[in-house]
Amino acid sequence: MSNSSSVSEFLLLAFADTRELQLLHFALFLGIYLAALLGNGLILTAVACDHHLHTPMYFFLLNLALLDQACISTTVPKAMANALWDTRTISYQGCAAQVLFFVFLVGAEYSILTIMAYDRYVAICKPLHYGSLLGSRACAQMAAAAWGSGFLYSILHTANTFSLPLCRGNVLDQFFCEIPDILKLSCSDAYLREAALLVVSFCLAFACFVFISFSYVQIFRAMLRMPSEQDQRKAFSTCLPHLAVVSLTLSTALVAYLKPPSISSPSLDMVVSFLYSVVPPAVNPLIYSMRNQELKHALWKLIGYMLLLHQ
């Protein structure tokens, strides 16, 4: 990273030019951030405290909630601070840390979502083997592999990005540090690295998508063979939240990274980045708690217990 020592800080894209709009954006981000912390925090606490939820499905949901909570905490607090204090700066080290943690958490989240599809596949297509295929040790190993692969992926891409010399200014057209925007500041021809980065990321996301799609093809075939409509409805209700979360996560990421350059602009890029980096972590707890009766019951029991403690 010594090649980039001439850059000591970066300037992030401001949300608005006027002070009133900056404060409005601060209030908006604060509301979304608190909602995400509350939603994911409730899921974490409910799954950890309710022994009825100590199953593989909820173990992976706990991992997802933890990743969502950490992911939104990587980008939003700095954006809120900049809007509140009317500044745009982030230190070089802070930017590197933001890239490292964001890529790590997003990569691990895609892996967890893929594992959750496998969990639903085994539960519906191979119910008699569920205990042996998804025992406590197997679940812990899969979760560790997801977190570990995300961290390795992040280390490689962060080191690749910040090893480049930067001499095209220090202004990033984004409200947080993203690798494509940093590569645009490189003195060297970074197009090959940027293309390789896009290809690797796309291949990994596509591999997750193919595995998830294959799992759900098998799941839907198994559901159609179920004799009872009630069993079909119950099986579908356990899959619907995961399908919704996967659709939201992958669709927003694809729009962000595969949109045509001809329609790209700083304002549009910022909106798209907001959609894929802020919206899923805030909305995922709502998606999972809407149709899941077990989780709703555990959440209401937890809320009732908390209210009782404050009386």
How should these model regions be labeled?
Residues M1-Q311:
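Transmembrane helical core of 7TM receptor-like proteins
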